[in-house]
């Protein structure tokens, strides 16, 4: 893998890409898996509802796409209020990665990925709204409902749009904060005597 990274870096240098880029194996695996998911969305859902559904715990072995992120301290540092604010996007990503999930699995996934305790009273209305909006399909089984992505491209575009807005906001806020720090250090407040 190191040879591939070195080859990629040298190709970037030869192409005149002027950037200090660092690669890590989990980042590349996640990016490659995401690219494969976006290119081949046919496996994300099926047209026929399943006849039998078995709970599958979210593990690194079962879902290599999220392996680098499971039990990650940075993700566990995200506040429950932020998770609740963006629960639609979180649910769409988790259901897309899984290819389908029931509510119990999604609650466990959110807890495992983010350390957040989202209540069923918060999550289930959002699943219904996503289904009503045509982003999810819901199959009713004997003891549970299974949610699948109805239109993978629409789901990806929705999440991508929200993520872009969040990144733009975060970069803008961080830039303003950096300017404030620079201005304060350049113009110290007079001390009271």
Swiss-Prot record:
CDD domains reported for this sequence: HTH_ARSR
InterPro entries in UniProt: ArsR-like_HTH, Tscrpt_reg_PadR_N, WH-like_DNA-bd_sf, WH_DNA-bd_sf
Identification of the protein by name: Transcriptional activator GvpE2
The keyword Transcription regulation is annotated on this UniProt entry: yes
Origin superkingdom: Archaea
Molecular function via GO: DNA binding
Activity modulation notes: Degraded once GvpD is translated; degradation requires 'Arg-494' of GvpD; tested in transgenic H.volcanii. Fusion of green fluorescent protein to its C-terminus partially protects it from degradation.
SUPFAM superfamilies attached to this UniProt entry: Winged helix' DNA-binding domain (SSF46785)
Encoding gene, per UniProt annotation: gvpE2
Consequence when changing residue 180 to D/L: Still activates transcription
Signal peptide residues on this chain, from the entry's feature table: none
UniProt cross-references to Gene3D superfamilies, sorted A to Z: Winged helix-like DNA-binding domain superfamily/Winged helix DNA-binding domain
Subcellular location: Cytoplasm
Species of provenance: Halobacterium salinarum (strain ATCC 700922 / JCM 11081 / NRC-1) (Halobacterium halobium)
Other comment: Encoded in a 14-gene locus called c-vac which produces cylindrical gas vesicles only in the stationary growth phase. In Schmidt et al., GvpD comes from H.mediterranei while GvpE is from the c-locus of H.salinarum.
Residues that hold DNA according to the record: 143-148
General function of this protein: Plays a regulatory role in gas vesicle synthesis, required to activate transcription of the c-gvpA operon. Gas vesicles are hollow, gas filled proteinaceous nanostructures found in several microbial planktonic microorganisms. They allow positioning of halobacteria at the optimal depth for growth in the poorly aerated, shallow brine pools of their habitat. Expression of 2 c-vac DNA fragments containing 2 divergently transcribed regions (gvpE-gvpF-gvpG-gvpH-gvpI-gvpJ-gvpK-gvpL-gvpM and gvpA-gvpC-gvpN-gvpO) allows H.volcanii to produce gas vesicles. All site-directed mutagenesis is tested in H.volcanii.
Annotated region (Leucine-zipper), positions in chain: 153-184
GO cellular component: cytoplasm
Stated induction or repression of this protein's expression: In PHH4 (a deletion of the p-vac locus) detected starting late in exponential growth, increasing in level by stationary phase and remaining at that level (at protein level). Transcribed in all growth phases, maximal expression in mid-stationary phase. An unstable 6kb transcript able to cover gvpD-gvpE-gvpF-gvpG-gvpH-gvpI-gvpJ-gvpK-gvpL-gvpM is detected, as well as smaller transcripts. Not translated in strain PHH1, which has an intact p-vac locus. Gas vesicles appear earlier when grown in static culture, possibly due to O(2)-limitation.
Keywords, sorted A to Z: Activator, Cytoplasm, DNA-binding, Plasmid, Transcription, Transcription regulation
Effect ascribed to mutating residue 104 to A: About 5% transcription activation
Subunit structure: Homodimer. Interacts with endogenous GvpD, also with GvpD from H.mediterranei.
């Amino acid at each position: 893998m190191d040879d591939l990274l070195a080859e990629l870096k040298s190709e970037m240098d030869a192409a005149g890409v002027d950037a200090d880029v660092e690669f890590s194996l989990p980042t590349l695996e996640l990016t490659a898996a995401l690219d494969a998911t976006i290119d081949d969305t046919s496996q994300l859902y099926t047209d026929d509802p399943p006849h039998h559904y078995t709970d599958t715990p979210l593990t690194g072995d079962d879902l290599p796409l999220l392996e680098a992120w499971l039990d990650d301290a940075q993700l566990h540092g995200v506040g429950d209020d932020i998770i609740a604010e963006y629960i639609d996007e979180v649910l769409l990503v988790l259901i897309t990665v899984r290819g389908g999930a029931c509510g119990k699995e999604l609650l466990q996934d959110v807890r495992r990925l983010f350390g957040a305790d989202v209540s069923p009273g918060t999550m289930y209305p959002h699943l219904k709204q996503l289904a009503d909006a045509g982003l999810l399909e819901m199959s009713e089984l004997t003891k549970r409902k299974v949610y699948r992505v109805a239109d993978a491209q629409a789901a990806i575009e929705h999440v991508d749009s929200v993520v872009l807005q969040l990144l733009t906001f975060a970069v803008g806020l961080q830039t303003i904060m950096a300017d404030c720090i620079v201005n304060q250090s350049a113009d110290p407040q007079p001390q009271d005597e």
